[in-house]
């Protein structure tokens, strides 16, 4: 979880609360399926502002595509409540491992902050 004291501005507190709320919800809803959640992108680099989306990578055990879409869909409700756009990518552990040599995943591993 992101500690609220890590952030200082109102925007950052809203972001922190939204990330914590979303990750708690998917952990509660999907349990042991959720293996890791990693914050990456501008907020992970402390460069986010009120116009920035929040990039989260959710790593799961092997699940059907429908479950991945449900995990992504769960994030949509947060935009209407908070104006925070959660941009969710979902990879299984195997997919994440296979993608480690690609720049997208390498960047996440370098700059990302593990939330769960």
Segments the model singles out, each with a brief description of its role:
Residues 55-58:
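Short beta-strand->loop micro-motif that forms the acidic, two-metal-ion catalytic signature
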């Amino acid at each position: 979880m992101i500690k609220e004291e890590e952030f200082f501005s109102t925007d950052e507190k809203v972001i922190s609360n939204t990330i914590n709320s979303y990750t708690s919800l998917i952990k509660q809803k999907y349990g042991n399926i959720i293996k890791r959640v990693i914050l990456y992108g501008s907020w992970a680099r402390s460069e986010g502002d009120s116009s920035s989306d929040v990039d989260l990578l959710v790593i799961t055990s092997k699940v059907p595509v429908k479950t991945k879409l449900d995990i992504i869909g769960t994030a949509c409700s947060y935009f209407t409540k908070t104006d925070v756009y959660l941009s969710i990518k979902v990879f299984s552990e195997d997919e994440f491992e296979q993608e480690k040599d690609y720049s997208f995943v390498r960047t996440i591993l370098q700059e990302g902050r593990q939330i769960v």
